[in-house]
């Protein structure tokens, strides 16, 4: 068989050759050649890095270290917003001035349906949020041209007077009552007056609204300004149930004071109910009523027989008073009235004394004689009694 293949000149297949024959078939520049040593490989790969470090030794220290796999730190809470305190506390004392400046309010009851009501006994205005509150301005003579009316709110209690009265964060961000004219943090607004200016004092940080003074219309004796209070008295982050005062000042064009007046304000959901409750508590405590300024047009409290408690009659005291009366005829009238009252008191005292003596006499007589209706009881002794 072998002789026949050699004779025909056919070469055996590659799989039948030896390994040494296959090794010799590889090219001479093979990468797997034994002539390529490990040192040559290191020089080929590491020489660029070595040259860069030799040329820039300072940059090697600035090579950033790989970031460490640490847990993310919790976010720090946002700092609480602290509003600046005001170093200026405006006066709240009533000052009529040379123009006899005073305030007036419309008469309104204590029904649940009212949205704004004023209590003369408390000198306090009760109103709902963003509802119309008419305030009347009275003067004895027209002020000079350029006179302005300023409204500013301050806290009533002394421990909060340095804080600026502003709306709560909820109502500041709310767009329900935004008119685009007043800043969102202002509490007091003027309704229906495009000439109103809302001012933020850079020194005192206080908010105020200023409108030009307009003389009364024909047939009217006073000027009326409609104010709105844009936050409830119970709002957290705002007034927070702290009572406030609204100061109304009359100023000339240069800012000089011409008159001042003030009143307390409570912004609530039911003004009529709150006014009735506070007036009843006020009468129970027996506190002295704050006197309105002289010549004020503030309405008097309507007499109510249901809410006011019945006052007990006090006993007569022994004090004497002197009353100066002008005119002889009026003096005789009061003298006769006084004599009649003295006679009545004497008769009352005499009758009470006689009744007291008669009642004591009857009691003593009853104690001495037995009653005629009662029969005397005797003890009978029988034959069986021992």
Curated annotation (Swiss-Prot):
Cofactor: Zn(2+)
UniProt motif Bipartite nuclear localization signal: location: 298-314
Modified residues (Omega-N-methylarginine): 326
Modified residues (Phosphothreonine): 18, 277
Region (Oligomerization): 318-349
Pfam family, one: P53
Residues annotated with Phosphoserine modification: 15, 20, 33, 37, 47, 175, 262, 308, 385
Sequence positions bearing N6-acetyllysine: 112, 298, 314, 366, 374-375
Region (Interaction with E4F1): 249-287
Alphabetical keyword list: Acetylation, Activator, Apoptosis, Biological rhythms, Cell cycle, Cytoplasm, Cytoskeleton, DNA-binding, Endoplasmic reticulum, Isopeptide bond, Metal-binding, Methylation, Mitochondrion, Necrosis, Nucleus, Phosphoprotein, Repressor, Transcription, Transcription regulation, Tumor suppressor, Ubl conjugation, Zinc
Compositionally biased residues, Pro residues: 64-76
UniProt binding sites for Zn(2+): 168, 171, 231, 235
Top-level taxonomic group: Eukaryota
Motif (Nuclear export signal): 332-343
Stated role: Multifunctional transcription factor that induces cell cycle arrest, DNA repair or apoptosis upon binding to its target DNA sequence. Acts as a tumor suppressor in many tumor types; induces growth arrest or apoptosis depending on the physiological circumstances and cell type. Negatively regulates cell division by controlling expression of a set of genes required for this process. One of the activated genes is an inhibitor of cyclin-dependent kinases. Apoptosis induction seems to be mediated either by stimulation of BAX and FAS antigen expression, or by repression of Bcl-2 expression.
Associated pathology: p53 is found in increased amounts in a wide variety of transformed cells. p53 is frequently mutated or inactivated in many types of cancer.
UniProt note: domains: The N-terminal and C-terminal disordered regions undergo liquid-liquid phase separation (LLPS) following homotetramerization and activation. Post-translational modifications, such as phosphorylation or lactylation affect the ability to undergo LLPS. The nuclear export signal acts as a transcriptional repression domain. The TADI and TADII motifs (residues 17 to 25 and 48 to 56) correspond both to 9aaTAD motifs which are transactivation domains present in a large number of yeast and animal transcription factors.
Protein name (database record): Cellular tumor antigen p53
Protein species of origin: Sus scrofa
Gene giving rise to this polypeptide: TP53
């Amino acid at each position: 068989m072998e002789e026949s293949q050699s004779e025909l000149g056919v070469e055996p297949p590659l799989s039948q050759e030896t390994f040494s024959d296959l090794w010799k078939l590889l090219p001479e520049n093979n990468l797997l050649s034994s002539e390529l040593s490990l040192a040559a490989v290191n020089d080929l790969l590491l020489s660029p890095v070595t040259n860069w470090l030799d040329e820039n030794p300072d940059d090697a220290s600035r090579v950033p270290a790989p970031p460490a796999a640490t847990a993310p730190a919790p976010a720090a809470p946002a700092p609480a917003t602290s509003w600046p305190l005001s170093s200026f506390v405006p006066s709240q004392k009533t000052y009529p001035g040379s123009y006899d400046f005073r305030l007036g309010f419309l008469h309104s009851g204590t029904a649940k349906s009212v949205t704004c009501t004023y209590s003369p006994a408390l000198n306090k205005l009760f109103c709902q949020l963003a509802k119309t509150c008419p305030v009347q301005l009275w003067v004895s003579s027209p002020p000079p041209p350029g006179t302005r009316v300023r409204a500013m709110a301050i806290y009533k209690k002394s421990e909060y007077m340095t804080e600026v009265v502003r709306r709560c964060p909820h109502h500041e961000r709310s767009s329900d009552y935004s008119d685009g004219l007043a800043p969102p943090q202002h509490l007091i607004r003027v309704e229906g007056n495009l000439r109103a200016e809302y001012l933020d004092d850079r020194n005192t940080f206080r908010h105020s609204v200023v409108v030009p003074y307009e003389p009364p219309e024909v047939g009217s004796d006073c000027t009326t300004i409609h104010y709105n209070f844009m936050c409830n008295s119970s709002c957290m982050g705002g007034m927070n149930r702290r009572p406030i005062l609204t100061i109304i000042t009359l100023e000339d064009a240069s800012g000089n004071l011409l008159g001042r007046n003030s009143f307390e304000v409570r912004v609530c959901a039911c003004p009529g109910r709150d006014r009735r409750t506070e007036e009843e508590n006020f009468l129970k405590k027996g506190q002295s009523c704050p006197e309105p300024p002289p010549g004020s047009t503030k309405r008097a409290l309507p007499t109510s027989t249901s809410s006011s408690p019945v006052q007990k009659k006090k006993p007569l005291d022994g004090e004497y008073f002197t009353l100066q009366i002008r005119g002889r005829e009026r003096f005789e009238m009061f003298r006769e009235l006084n004599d009649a009252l003295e006679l009545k008191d004497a008769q009352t005292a005499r009758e009470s004394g006689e009744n007291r003596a008669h009642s004591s006499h009857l009691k003593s007589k009853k104690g001495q004689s037995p009653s005629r209706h009662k029969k005397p009881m005797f003890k009978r002794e029988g034959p069986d009694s021992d």
